[in-house]
Amino acid sequence: MALLTNGKGFIRALEKSGSLAVYAPLEGGFEGRYQRRLRTNGYHTFSLTARGLGDVSAYLMGVHGVRPPHLGKKNIGQEAAVGPVYFVPPIAAYQLETLPPKSKGLVLWILEGFILSQTELEYLANLPTLEPRLKVVIELGGERYFSWKPLPEVIKVA
């Protein structure tokens, strides 16, 4: 059980700053270990990739419209020329609503965060101040060992 009780420095840093930039070895495996450590400390984790997020604020915290691919079929005169709009609930806000009462909060673990723009990273760094039960971990690149830094510090350097 010692494997599950380690990682307290990571959890303390996440609770202190609210958002972390993570650098993990490219062969993988470390993400699952640290997510398991978060879950044993009372957090719920939600993994998603940064590719295809679109408007990060709308996708995570607001109801947003999505147009599915039309696949060559069009309804003439009934809908918009670009197709119907389906409204999707916000991913993070919905997960926060369904958290158990004894949970410490929700950790969004975002893969491939290196493709996000500076503005999107700033929004994700400020998101825990808007919603205190929400923490953010973004994988920003590879390293020979698992390391992390507070996301606001990484944004200031860039």
UniProtKB/Swiss-Prot annotation:
InterPro entries reported in the protein's UniProt record: NAD(P)H-quinone_OxRdtase_su_N (IPR020874)
UniProt superkingdom: Bacteria
Membrane topology summary: Peripheral membrane protein
Reactions that this protein is recorded to catalyse: a plastoquinone + NADH + (n+1) H(+)(in) = a plastoquinol + NAD(+) + n H(+)(out); a plastoquinone + NADPH + (n+1) H(+)(in) = a plastoquinol + NADP(+) + n H(+)(out)
GO molecular function, one term: quinone binding
EC identifiers of the protein: 7.1.1.-
Keywords, in A-Z order: Membrane, NAD, NADP, Plastoquinone, Quinone, Thylakoid, Translocase, Transport
Compartment annotation: Cellular thylakoid membrane
Principal location class: membrane
Gene Ontology cellular component list: plasma membrane-derived thylakoid membrane
Entry keyword Repressor: no
Annotated family: Belongs to the complex I NdhN subunit family.
Subunit structure comment from the entry: NDH-1 can be composed of about 15 different subunits; different subcomplexes with different compositions have been identified which probably have different functions.
UniProt-listed HAMAP family: NDH1_NDH1N
Function as written in the Swiss-Prot or TrEMBL entry: NDH-1 shuttles electrons from an unknown electron donor, via FMN and iron-sulfur (Fe-S) centers, to quinones in the respiratory and/or the photosynthetic chain. The immediate electron acceptor for the enzyme in this species is believed to be plastoquinone. Couples the redox reaction to proton translocation, and thus conserves the redox energy in a proton gradient. Cyanobacterial NDH-1 also plays a role in inorganic carbon-concentration.
Name of the featured protein: NAD(P)H-quinone oxidoreductase subunit N
Source species of the chain: Rippkaea orientalis (strain PCC 8801 / RF-1)
Protein's gene: ndhN
